[in-house]
Design a protein with these regions (language model features):
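Catalytic metal-binding core of the metallo-beta-lactamase
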Residues: 1-112, 190, 194, 198-313
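Short, charge-rich, low-complexity alpha-helical interaction segments
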Residues: 7, 45, 178-186
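Bilayer-spanning, highly hydrophobic alpha-helical transmembrane segments
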Residues: 92, 98-178, 297-343
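Membrane interface segments of multi-pass transport proteins and intramembrane proteases
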Residues: 137-145, 180-200
Length: 343
């Protein structure tokens, strides 16, 4: 279910409605959305048959539901905490969608600049430079080395653009396939990204923030600590971090603390402030509260770091574009200067 519907469902339940009545009301608002309407109809039918909201969500086949979400709903239904859990789940999914949208919007401007720059450079090299320098070649004048270099690039691009285009898309498809189907490749790439300046910290903040929020949410829902840790580890998208936490989660099931298990385990060691906060939470039995604060801290940190990354990216791209255009302009003007000096 989407974040707005989870919050709406919680408000209906808070007003005294039954789950069935609330689902029917929400279903009536989404009749034009075929897949989502089918999902809601499936829930309504199963609840009418006497199934709980958890069983209906777990049984329906329209959408795949995250395990942590299902288990939180299951425990919340048994403990009478359904309303606050639905609100928290709605807030979580809403914040995740907002972060994704912010990153997408932030990358639009640099991407547009990059595409325009590539297009402009390709046009100059493929069409403008050959026509201008061709005039000087006809005179038998020796062209400057930079002009010869640009002409060589122009000839190469003009003669091989189809192969280059196929190769470009082939690399993208090959990378995506390797990342999806080769766990070894995924681990190597994810490990490399974690070591990248700024980007690595952005990734770790996002991964740890999401883990912290979900673990906090499930503990508030009444899920046992060991079970909550195991479910929360499934939310990691970075293979290196997921492997470290999965190994630690197994030790937690055996009775160890998560902070100790991560400290003694192999693989990626999480950030120091996360480890300190986790250890403090486990010592004081306030894991849910402390990790909830950590999740908010990482969200704010990432917002600031994303702005910094973009502020560095834009001037770098402008400098790169200026350098490329400058080389092309120099390649066109130097033969003219050489001719004037010769005359």
């Amino acid at each position: 279910m989407c974040s707005s519907d989870l919050k709406e469902l919680s408000s209906y339940l808070n007003s005294g409605m039954t789950v069935l009545t609330a689902i029917k009301l929400i279903e009536g608002q989404h009749k034009k959305e075929k897949k989502y309407a089918s999902f809601l109809a499936s829930l309504r039918t199963m609840i009418e048959e006497g199934k709980s909201l958890y069983n209906a969500l777990a049984t329906q086949s329209v959408y795949s539901m995250p395990d942590f979400f299902l288990q939180s709903i299951n425990v919340a239904g048994q403990s009478g905490k359904m309303i606050p859990v639905l609100i928290q789940m709605g807030t979580f999914f809403s914040s995740q969608a907002k972060v994704k949208k912010q990153v997408g919007n932030a990358m639009v401007y640099p991407l547009v600049i990059f595409i325009v720059a590539i297009g402009m450079t390709a046009f100059l090299i493929a069409f403008v430079v050959p026509k201008i320098t061709g005039i000087f070649e006809d005179t038998g004048q020796k062209l400057p080395e930079i002009t010869q270099f640009v002409l060589g690039v122009s000839d190469f691009l003009s003669g091989n653009w189809i192969i280059l285009l196929i190769g470009f898309f082939g690399i993208i498809i090959g990378f995506k396939s390797a990342y999806k189907y080769s766990y070894t490749f995924k681990k190597i790439y994810d490990g490399f990204m974690l070591k990248m300046p700024i980007i690595g910290e952005l990734i770790q903040n996002h991964e740890l923030g999401r883990f912290s929020y979900i673990l906090s949410l499930m503990l508030d829902s009444g899920v046992s600590y060991a079970h909550a840790v195991k479910l929360a580890t499934t939310t990691f998208s970075n293979a290196m971090m997921k492997e470290s936490f999965e190994s630690a989660a197994e030790r937690v099931i055996e009775g160890n603390k998560l902070s100790h298990s991560l400290q003694r385990g192999k693989g990626v060691l999480p950030k120091r402030n996360f480890m300190q906060a986790l250890a403090l939470g486990e010592e004081s039995s306030e894991v849910a509260s402390i990790l909830g604060n950590i999740a908010e801290l990482y969200r704010e940190e990432n917002a600031d770091k994303l702005k910094l990354l973009l502020s560095l990216l834009e001037p770098f791209m402008m400098l790169f574009i200026g350098l490329v255009v400058g080389v092309i302009v120099a390649a066109m003007l130097l033969p003219i200067f050489s001719m004037n000096l010769g005359s």
